[in-house]
Design a protein with these regions (language model features):
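A helix-coil-helix interface module used to build multimeric assemblies
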Residues: 1-202, 207-214, 220, 275-276, ...
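Glycine-rich cofactor/substrate-binding loops
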Residues: 2-37, 98-99, 280-459
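Generic, well-ordered alpha-helical scaffold segments in large soluble proteins
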Residues: 41, 62, 66-69, 91, ...
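Conserved hydrophobic residue
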Residues: 51, 75, 264-265, 380, ...
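Alpha-helix capping and helix-loop boundary segments enriched in small/acidic/polar residues
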Residues: 104, 109-112, 156-163, 167, ...
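Short amphipathic alpha-helical segments with heptad-repeat character
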Residues: 118, 122-129, 133, 140, ...
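Conserved helix-loop functional segments at active or binding sites
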Residues: 145, 182-185, 189, 218-222, ...
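Acidic, glycine-rich loop-and-beta core segments that form the ion-binding/anion-interacting portion
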Residues: 216-308
Length: 459
């Protein structure tokens, strides 16, 4: 059992205690970040004259050889080490001797693990950003191709007003755009280096924390050594942002599941993103969308877990904080997988434009426009609302739609109606006369698509 402590103990650690306490099974995930931090630390120590240049070079060479061997599969990270820090240090000492024992000068595992976690989260935020951006590109492409794909918009899962598929996809574009902004915000707030904070009270060595921070492209050093090692609010922020991404993916998945059903038939999911049944040969199931929806709770659970872990911990570091890693690693991997699969699914999905438009023609999605027609002819809106309500009731009784009513039937309910009512309530007219920015009309949506392209090219 390789440990970085033990001098003041008279007994060996109980095997059960060792296994319970060890984190090597999961913190090996930031092996590369641990080495990155150690290389920066050693470089700074030599700059400050705490290590010689020769010692620095020997240690750096040793660290590079460890990375090369691990990456090549020649060196295995095993459970005989308590954590990734002890794995790196023990192997370094084996390779370079006494120089390796100086690696930890002016450093505690508390600031070391805080640094590793920040480096890891920072790297993963950049990967998540790429995935969200690609999803935005996919959405904008669908928008551009479907400016005239008419469909019903819904409230309460009931047909409400006619829109376009471009407009519907645009709603999700805005959601994921904000998700991307949240990731950027987190990156900016967390991008300060904790290295040099020690266990909680800094160190007596003349460290150059600004230099260490610059070597790893941080904005600068953190300004309170206790806060540096004692908080994981950036992890909580990340898990909150990931939960919001998953909430958006889950809502989108729910709609795709509904749209893919035989009752709606708005879309057909590609075979590559569908599965079948072991007993029912006719089935083609939207399992990817269902799994994305299901995995949302998994990410929510990670957020609630770290919030609960951190809520009662006195300053500074406590071992409870070791519990931040597995759930964060899992949440990040889950969201990355969901984003990639979801992007592939919607980019290959077939939209049934004729079914969508036909659906918009039924269900009285043009009722609001019939009321607006009356208002434009001098009828107060509240009266117009009541008149159109009676029209809908009449149509329901007759089993017809508003555009199937004769002019005589219209006039029986209100003499204001004339022949131009039919153009006013045509689904395409209903959509296209909505031209303000943010509305579903094709001219308005063209502008949005171009704004989206500009945003994606600049960000």
């Amino acid at each position: 059992m390789a440990q970085l402590w033990g001098g003041r103990f008279t007994k060996e650690t109980d095997k059960l205690v060792y296994n319970f306490n060890a984190s090597i099974g999961f913190d090996q995930k930031f092996f590369h970040q641990d080495v990155q931090g150690s290389k920066a630390h050693v470089t700074m120590l030599a700059k400050q004259g705490i290590l010689t240049e020769n010692e620095r070079d020997v240690i750096l060479k040793g660290l590079d050889s460890i990375v090369a061997d691990v990456d090549a599969g020649k060196l295995e990270i095993t459970s005989e080490y308590e954590d990734i820090h002890s794995f790196v240090e023990a192997n370094l000492i084996d390779r370079v001797g006494d120089a390796g024992k100086k690696l930890h000068t002016g450093r505690s595992r508390n600031d070391q693990v805080a640094l590793d976690m920040k480096l890891y989260v920072r790297d993963e935020i950049q990967e998540l950003d790429k995935l969200v951006k690609h999803l935005l590109e996919t959405l904008n492409k669908i928008m551009e191709e479907n400016l005239h794909t008419y469909m019903p918009g819904f409230t309460h899962l009931q047909k409400a007003q006619p829109i376009t598929l471009a407009h519907h996809m645009g709603a999700y574009f805005e959601m994921f755009k904000r998700d991307r902004s949240r990731l950027s915000d987190i990156y900016g707030r967390m991008n300060y280096c904790p290295l040099g904070s020690g266990a909680l009270a800094g160190t007596t060595y003349p460290l150059d924390r600004e230099y260490s921070a610059s070597l790893m492209e941080f904005e600068g050093p953190t300004l309170n050594s206790m806060d540096s090692v004692a908080d994981r609010d950036y992890v909580i922020e990340l898990l909150s942002a990931l939960s919001t991404i998953m909430m958006h993916l889950s809502r989108f998945s729910e709609e795709i599941i509904i749209w893919n059903s035989n009752e709606y038939r708005f879309v057909e999911i590609d075979d590559a993103y569908s599965t079948g049944s072991s007993i029912m040969p006719q089935k083609k199931n939207p399992d990817i969308a269902e799994l994305v929806r299901g995995k949302t709770g998994r990410v929510y659970g990670a957020l609630m877990s770290i919030l609960t872990t951190m809520k009662g911990i006195p300053l500074a570091y406590n071992k409870d904080m070791q519990e931040d890693k597995e759930l964060t690693f899992d949440a990040i991997d889950t969201v990355k997988g969901c984003l990639a699969l979801f992007d592939g699914m919607i980019s290959t999905m077939k939209f049934r434009n004729d079914v969508m438009e036909d659906s918009a023609k039924h269900g009285f999605t043009n009722a609001t426009d019939a009321a607006d027609y009356l208002v434009n002819h001098g009828v107060p809106f509240r009266d117009a609302h009541g008149i159109v309500g009676r029209l809908v009731l009449y149509c329901l009784d007759k089993g017809i739609s508003l555009d199937e009513m004769s002019l005589e039937e219209y006039k029986e309910i209100s003499p204001v109606f004339e022949n131009d009512i039919y153009d006013a309530i045509s689904i395409r007219t209903c959509v296209e006369k909505r031209m303000t920015i943010g509305a579903p009309g094709s001219e308005a949506m063209k502008k949005v698509v171009e704004l989206n392209k500009k945003y994606l090219s600049e960000n």
